[in-house]
Amino acid sequence: MHIAVVGLSHRTAPVEIRERLSIPEQSMEMSLKTLRGNDQVLEASILSTCNRLEIYTLVRHPELGVGAVNEFLSNHSGLQTGELSPHLFNFHHQDAVDHLLRVAAGLDSLVLGEGQILSQVKKMMRLGQEHKSLGPILNRLLTQAVTTGKKVRSETNLGTGAVSISSAAVELAQLKLGQSRGVDDLVSLESEQIAVVGAGRMSRLLLQHLQAKGASGVVLVNRTVETAERLANDFPDLSVECRPLTDLNTFLSTSSLVFTSTAAEDPIIDASRLKPLNRRSQLRLIDIGVPRNVAADAATVDGVESHDVDDLEEVVARNQEARQAIAREAEHLLQDEAQQFLDWWDSLEAVPTINQLRSSMETIRTEELQKALSRMGPDFSARERKVVEALSKGIINKILHTPVTKLRASQARSERQQALRAVERLFDLDPS
């Protein structure tokens, strides 16, 4: 068996490719079922965010297993394997383990050390458990990843002051506004007419950062006004007006700055919607949705400036240099955590031998116990029989405890294999 991960991220694929492979939560059960339906895939888990899609699997054969995942991705996205392959990465065994731990720690994120990715890894594990696509190996690996993500943030300063996708989007707006005024710095949003489209987790974070950056008011646009109102109630110090998505054109006409973050699978803003508005002032669209909420042709409309998640690099670069030293400290911690999992994984090769050894001892115990009990005759009470049986089990468990513990103990793989072969020869075992 082999652990493998196949995926793409902001490092390997532009947003127009990433959005083709994005898997919404409502499609996760079927996607996991499809993967597990392949004979090569024993366990599977999917991480789908705005900046990455990664499929972690336990497979029978590395090449055939990766081939099965590639076929799934091609079918899901409608892209030929040749179109996808330049954007995909795949890692096996220790490299796959190292990669997942780096992801959970925020070391592979666009925004170094961002905290949201850990919640997304937890969600990946929860969905895998709910849809029964996880087995003991990936369940243990994901648990180790979550533990590692927490440990990195508690034992280093990596999470302190880290920007998020949402905060980077707000800073990008400030930066672009400043540049339009001839200032290469972040400017206040106090005088801007701002709209936020969507009322999910990312929109909540947008409202937090808009409030912190001086926004005086925000129009919150959502399909369901009640959902928007519940979110707005959490920001009593920010003036938030909630409106239905059917009023979107009104706010595209009057706003100077519009953030979009919805779960829509197709763009909700494009050139055909913007052109008839006849705007007289600049409109900046900042889209952090994946799939994108704003079509690429929106930027062709006069007076419209459009940005997506890939444009956040400009802001992120301003914040990263000071965090690199902390990241190096976190990398050392990750090495220890990865080794813990790999030691556990290596110890699993002892399980078949241990199970057969226990089975062999149990057979001997029951046979000898029956011989002894038959010699005791009918005067031997049921209670006395139970005492003798418990005694026989206790003796076997005591005898096996030390050798079983040593076979499972962390040690060089060659030493463990040598010990296993010795036990198999001594007790005439055949764990295969």
Swiss-Prot record:
It catalyses: (S)-4-amino-5-oxopentanoate + tRNA(Glu) + NADP(+) = L-glutamyl-tRNA(Glu) + NADPH + H(+). It comes from the Bacteria. It holds the Pfam family Shikimate_DH. The keyword Oxidoreductase applies. Substrate binds at residues 49-52, 109, 114-116, 120. One of its GO terms (biological process) is chlorophyll biosynthetic process. Its EC number is 1.2.1.70. CDD domains: NAD_bind_Glutamyl_tRNA_reduct (cd05213). Pathway: Porphyrin-containing compound metabolism; protoporphyrin-IX biosynthesis; 5-aminolevulinate from L-glutamyl-tRNA(Glu): step 1/2; Porphyrin-containing compound metabolism; chlorophyll biosynthesis. Coiled coil: none annotated. The active site is at residue 50. InterPro entries: 4pyrrol_synth_GluRdtase, 4pyrrol_synth_GluRdtase_dimer, 4pyrrol_synth_GluRdtase_N, GluRdtase_CS, GluRdtase_dimer_dom_sf, GluRdtase_N_sf, NAD(P)-bd_dom_sf, Shikm_DH/Glu-tRNA_Rdtase. NADP(+) binds at residues 198-203. Homodimer. During catalysis, the active site Cys acts as a nucleophile attacking the alpha-carbonyl group of tRNA-bound glutamate with the formation of a thioester intermediate between enzyme and glutamate, and the concomitant release of tRNA(Glu). The thioester intermediate is finally reduced by direct hydride transfer from NADPH, to form the product GSA. Belongs to the glutamyl-tRNA reductase family. This is Glutamyl-tRNA reductase.
